[in-house]
Amino acid sequence: MVQLLEHYFSEQGAGQARYRLMRRRASNEQRSWRYLDIINRMIDRPGGRSYRVILLGLFATLLQAKGTLRLDKDARPLLLIEDPETRLHPIMLSVAWHLLNLLPLQRIATTNSGELLSLTPVEHVCRLVRESSRVAAWRLGPSGLSTEDSRRISFHIRFNRPSSLFARCWLLVEGETETWVINELARQCGHHFDAEGIKVIEFAQSGLKPLVKFARRMGIEWHVLVDGDEAGKKYAATVRSLLNNDREAEREHLTALPALDMEHFMYRQGFSDVFHRVAQIPENVPMNLRKVISKAIHRSSKPDLAIEVAMEAGRRGVDSVPTLLKKMFSRVLWLARGRAD
């Protein structure tokens, strides 16, 4: 244990201390002491008991792995960690990972924890996908993402939706309304997206292109649902450009609503009575559908209105779910099952 500690924080072997100190460059020496200082301050401060326990366990593991071999002064042990979330509370997992990041170690960890993924830069994540005849590994690679795209993905996926990195397919929708409607209507059709590895993700905040580029690089299938308004047409054009205007690929990856937005689409698909009821406007009152929808949103909210429509579809049965959405569900399930084991 003494020799291992000396390897990291002083020198390898007490007898060679003076000789090695003279040979080592000043920058390396300062770095070693900086690591030691950081760890000392961490374990000495109030509430540092958890750090001390982790540090002792770590060094015990390293000592057992080292055996009687003498480590080179530039050696950096490779620490393999298998599913640490199975033994650690999420808070302790965060503490342990933070401590490991301070040590000059190489680390490979396998995990099914979104909590751990949220602590790891996406550039350091490698997805393992079990296919019919092999296990494929997907990662961003040396070129990675642009600085702006990396920032957007980190905020939208890593920090807010880390579990989506385990998904087989992303269904990308414009906003919260579509998220509520699509999840509920899929459930009523007997499709359990969570069990199929499908994640519905809104893209308006982060932008569509970064999400699609990231999904492709990480081996995640994807499908995009867009509105029929001007913004939706631009999103559709973005998808087509990413697919090199391949018509067959477009059928697999793009669904466009034949209406301005989800509210107008569902109104025309037989749910006008829901909008009139929420807007408190009798159906026999002549009024432009845009005004009816606007009043319904004003008296409720877009997400609440979407939930009302979805619940009404549940009461009416599967036949009330628009055919366009049923076809989209089938495509998304097909994409997801193509990645199934």
Label the predicted regions.
Residues 234-308:
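Activity-critical C-terminal alpha-helical subdomain
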Residues 34-160, 237, 334:
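Switch/communication elements of ASCE P-loop NTPase nucleotide-binding domains
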Residues 1-25:
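Amphipathic alpha-helical domain-onset/packing element
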Residues 117-118, 123-231:
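RecA-like P-loop NTPase motor core
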Residues 24-36:
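Active-site-adjacent bridging/hinge elements
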Residues 4-11, 62-63, 160, 185-192, ...:
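Conserved, well-folded catalytic cores of nucleic-acid-processing
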Residues 77-83, 199-202, 254-256:
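Extended hydrophobic secondary-structure segments that form protein cores and membrane-embedded regions
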